[in-house]
Amino acid sequence: MWRVRKRGYFGIWSFPLIIAAVCAQSVNDPSNMSLVKETVDRLLKGYDIRLRPDFGGPPVAVGMNIDIASIDMVSEVNMDYTLTMYFQQAWRDKRLSYNVIPLNLTLDNRVADQLWVPDTYFLNDKKSFVHGVTVKNRMIRLHPDGTVLYGLRITTTAACMMDLRRYPLDEQNCTLEIESYGYTTDDIEFYWRGDDNAVTGVTKIELPQFSIVDYKLITKKVVFSTGSYPRLSLSFKLKRNIGYFILQTYMPSILITILSWVSFWINYDASAARVALGITTVLTMTTINTHLRETLPKIPYVKAIDMYLMGCFVFVFMALLEYALVNYIFFGRGPQRQKKAAEKAANANNEKMRLDVNKMFYKDIKQNGTQYRSLWDPTGDLSPTRRTTNYDFSLYTMDPHENILLSTLEIKNEMATSEAVMGLGDPRSTMLAYDASSIQYRKAGLPRHSFGRNALERHVAQKKSRLRRRASQLKITIPDLTDVNAIDRWSRIFFPVVFSFFNIVYWLYYVN
């Protein structure tokens, strides 16, 4: 009894399998190929490619799947990306349903030219093509219920408008817009087959400069002047990998900036070495900047990498200007200031010497209503006048104080400016009288050497010694005010500290 029931159940469940096997065998059987041919001919006979399925009825629902093979290139210059994919569309066309053969019919790709297919296009497409090796990569598969599966292998270059303000620390959203070109939502509808699983292969993609962080599937309708159209969007979120730029741009810029600071340790009088180093680093930074601009589009705003390279260029250029300042102070401004200070001190000392000499050798005296200028030496050490001066006192008298009164003074030999009593070129050294008739000169009892040559020489020697001391002091103190070594020492600290602060602010701002 049990065996009979068991055999009965087995016969019921195995019947469809037997029918399918028989049908498959009949289809593959060359003698039954005529049945398949008749079925296809019947489907295509009288088929009007000009009319959509269910014309005049509800809109055709077209489901789409995408299997991404690769993303070949993302170009910042052209603002686009290249995508290779297997693009599949499925819809139901009752005119293509059949029940004679319970199997799917995969037909030659040329049959697609005889069937109605959706007028799908990529809205942001720049250039696309269907692969044709070894034959045109198209597939048509018919199901018994009239479902049509239409597959293509396509490579498309789609526009992707990028915001490069944070380049190369940026994230970009690139989309693929799929839309019907002629049919409105009254005739056709688009949807993603399998919902979130409609797009596959994203996780397997590896890009040299980007990582795919996420992707989204969007279904919407857009309205134009000609009507409302269905649209599907596939949006990729791409994050740029910074490793390449650290090795190719950031690290060379940092090292070149640090290299420019080596000039602070080179002696300030080594002009050739410091100037050559500064100019080399400036030109290298310019080359890096130029190469980077060639790989990016000409956009009106400043990018993150532009800010960094501009900062490095400023530091390199300032290092070169630092030596220009040092060179000017050491070889230009410093000696000029020393020379001016020395001249000013010498003029002040000469003026003071004149005043001291006048006070020492001339004394105004007024006696008996007559004003005299007396030549005297407070030290008491008098010396005879220079031999180059020859006086002839033709008339003289003695006053009660034993001073010689000269009524006539004849100077036989004119005194040169350089042969004056003080050697200062003062014309007053030859004028001994306030009035035209008499001069009080010296006491008669004093010897001829009372004109003080030794005292004058000692006084001049003291002034010269004092001037030398002041000049030596100037020579020591002036470089302290503009010390080139101090500028280099401060630069060794200032430049690295400010550059480190610049890097901290830059990376905190752009990374976060």
Curated annotation (Swiss-Prot):
The modification Phosphotyrosine is found at residue 441. Residues 327-489 are cytoplasmic. GO terms for molecular function: chloride channel activity; GABA-A receptor activity; GABA-gated chloride ion channel activity; transmitter-gated monoatomic ion channel activity involved in regulation of postsynaptic membrane potential. It comes from the Eukaryota. InterPro entries: GABAA/Glycine_rcpt, GABAAb_rcpt, Neur_chan_lig-bd, Neur_chan_lig-bd_sf, Neur_channel, Neuro-gated_channel_TM_sf, Neuro_actylchol_rec, Neurotrans-gated_channel_TM. Glycans are attached at residues 32, 104, 173. It is found in: Postsynaptic cell membrane; Cell membrane; Cytoplasmic vesicle. Glycosylated. The keyword Nucleotide-binding does not apply. Histamine binds at residues 121, 180-181, 226. Allosterically activated by benzodiazepines and the anesthetic etomidate. Inhibited by the antagonist bicuculline. Potentiated by histamine. Keywords: Cell membrane, Chloride, Chloride channel, Cytoplasmic vesicle, Disulfide bond, Glycoprotein, Ion channel, Ion transport, Ligand-gated ion channel, Membrane, Phosphoprotein, Postsynaptic cell membrane, Receptor, Signal, Synapse, Transmembrane, Transmembrane helix, Transport. Residues 1-25 form the signal peptide. The extracellular domain contributes to synaptic contact formation. GABAARs subunits share a common topological structure: a peptide sequence made up of a long extracellular N-terminal, four transmembrane domains, intracellular or cytoplasmic domain located between the third and the fourth transmembrane domains. Heteropentamer, formed by a combination of alpha (GABRA1-6), beta (GABRB1-3), gamma (GABRG1-3), delta (GABRD), epsilon (GABRE), rho (GABRR1-3), pi (GABRP) and theta (GABRQ) chains, each subunit exhibiting distinct physiological and pharmacological properties. Interacts with UBQLN1. May interact with KIF21B. Identified in a complex of 720 kDa composed of LHFPL4, NLGN2, GABRA1, GABRB2, GABRG2 and GABRB3. This is Gamma-aminobutyric acid receptor subunit beta-2. It comes from Mus musculus (Mouse). The lineage of its organism: Eukaryota, Metazoa, Chordata, Craniata, Vertebrata.
